C-alpha cells in the first residue's frame, strides 16, 4: 500500500524556492526508502511463513514435541500434584518392590537347592530291574488295598443285613465303623494269606517232621502212630505170605 501512494511534485514560487524543492526531494527519497523496507518486510514474512509450513510438512509432530518438552521442563513443587512420569516417590516404590521380588526369588532358589541336594534322577537303563521290582510291589499294594476295601464293605453289609429294617441300628453300625477297623482288615488280608500258605505247607509235610510230633501222646499209645503210618505196608506183606502157604498146602 505504501508503494501505491505517490506524492505530487509541487513547486512553490517563493523566495525560498531552493528550500522547498530540497524538502520535497527529501520527502520523496524517504517515501521510496519506506516502500523498499515494507516490501522487504513482506518478502521476509512470506519466506518465514513458507519455511514454517515446510518444517511442519516435513515433521508434523515437531510442535507437539516442543509443547511436551515445555510442559516437562517446568519445575513443580512437591506440594502440588505432578505427572506420574516425574513422580520420584513412585520410582522409589517400584525399586523397593523389585528388590523384594529378587530377595524372594533368591530364598526360593536356596530352598530348592537345599531340597535337591540328595535327589538323583533314576537311570532307566541301569535301574531297569529295580524299577520292575518297584512296579511289582506297587501293583501288589494296590491289589491288596482294593481287596481290603471289598472285604470291609462286605463285612459292613453283612452286619446291616443281620440288623434288619431298623434304621436306628443301621445308623449305629455305620457310626461304629472307623478307620481302625479298615486298617485291621487291611493288615489282616496279608496275615490271612500267610496263614493259609503255612497251613497248606504243614499238611503236605510228613508228620514226623512237625514240631508237635508225639507231644500229646501217652506211653501206651506209642505204637499207634507207627501202625497208622505203616499199616498198609504190613497188610501188603502178609498177603503174599498167605498165598505162599496156600500153595504149599
From Swiss-Prot:
**InterPro entries, alphabetized:** Rrp15 (IPR012459)
According to the UniProt entry, the coiled-coil residues are 83-113
Which intervals carry biased composition (Acidic residues)? Answer: 14-32, 43-57
Where is there biased composition of kind Basic and acidic residues? 220-229
Q: Which GO terms describe its cellular component?
A: preribosome, large subunit precursor
Record-linked Pfam families: Rrp15p
Q: Which keywords label this protein? A: Coiled coil
Where does the record place the region Disordered?
1-87, 217-249
Signal peptide span:
none
Give GO BP annotations, semicolon-separated. maturation of 5.8S rRNA; maturation of LSU-rRNA
Q: Identify its protein family.
A: Belongs to the RRP15 family.
Name the UniProt record assigns to this protein? RRP15-like protein
Instruction: Identify the coding gene.
Output: rrp15
Amino acid at each position: 500500500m505504501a508503494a501505491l501512494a505517490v506524492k505530487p511534485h509541487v513547486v512553490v514560487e517563493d523566495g525560498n524556492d531552493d528550500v522547498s524543492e530540497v524538502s520535497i526531494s527529501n520527502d520523496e527519497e524517504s517515501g521510496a526508502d519506506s516502500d523498499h523496507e515494507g516490501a522487504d518486510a513482506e518478502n521476509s514474512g512470506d519466506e518465514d511463513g513458507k519455511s514454517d509450513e515446510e518444517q511442519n510438512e516435513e515433521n508434523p509432530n515437531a510442535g507437539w514435541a516442543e509443547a511436551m518438552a515445555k510442559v516437562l521442563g517446568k519445575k513443580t513443587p512437591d506440594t502440588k500434584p505432578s505427572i506420574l512420569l516425574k513422580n520420584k516417590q513412585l520410582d522409589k516404590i517400584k525399586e523397593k518392590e523389585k528388590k523384594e521380588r529378587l530377595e524372594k526369588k533368591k530364598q526360593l532358589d536356596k530352598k530348592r537347592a537345599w531340597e535337591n541336594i540328595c535327589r538323583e534322577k533314576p537311570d532307566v537303563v541301569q535301574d531297569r530291574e529295580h524299577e520292575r521290582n518297584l512296579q511289582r510291589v506297587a501293583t501288589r499294594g494296590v491289589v491288596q488295598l482294593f481287596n481290603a476295601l471289598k472285604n470291609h464293605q462286605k463285612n459292613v453289609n453283612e452286619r446291616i443285613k443281620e440288623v434288619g429294617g431298623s434304621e436306628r441300628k443301621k445308623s449305629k453300625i455305620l457310626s461304629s465303623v472307623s478307620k481302625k477297623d479298615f486298617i485291621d482288615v487291611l493288615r489282616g488280608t496279608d496275615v490271612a494269606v500267610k496263614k493259609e500258605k503255612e497251613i497248606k505247607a504243614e499238611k503236605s509235610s510228613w508228620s514226623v517232621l512237625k514240631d508237635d510230633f508225639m507231644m500229646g501222646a501217652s506211653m501206651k499209645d506209642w505204637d499207634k502212630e507207627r501202625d497208622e503210618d505203616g499199616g498198609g505196608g504190613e497188610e501188603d506183606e502178609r498177603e503174599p505170605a498167605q498165598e505162599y502157604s496156600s500153595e504149599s498146602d
